[in-house]
Amino acid sequence: MILVNVHAGNCDNTLKNFKKKLQRELYFRKMKEQRYYETPSAKRVRKAQEAARRIRKFARKKMYEE
């Protein structure tokens, strides 16, 4: 459960903090994934693609650091 404190009726900052906390907990991604049923084989393919993307991103970062 996500708790957000409201200080002096400041709704704008409260809403901003709430959205930030939802993003940190990957809430929006989970909602998007659960919107439709994903077959186990499609899930494996997606996970492998995400892992490959992370590896390429890390390699690119490493290349620019050197």
UniProtKB/Swiss-Prot annotation:
Pfam families associated with the record: Ribosomal_S21 (PF01165)
Record's protein name: Small ribosomal subunit protein bS21
GO cellular component, one term: ribonucleoprotein complex
Gene Ontology biological-process annotations: translation
Superkingdom classification of source: Bacteria
Source species: Rickettsia prowazekii (strain Madrid E)
Keyword entries, A-Z: Ribonucleoprotein, Ribosomal protein
Protein family membership: Belongs to the bacterial ribosomal protein bS21 family.
Gene giving rise to this polypeptide: rpsU
Ribonucleoprotein among keywords: yes
InterPro entries, per the entry: Ribosomal_bS21, Ribosomal_bS21_sf
Gene Ontology molecular-function annotations: structural constituent of ribosome
Tagged with keyword Ribosomal protein: yes
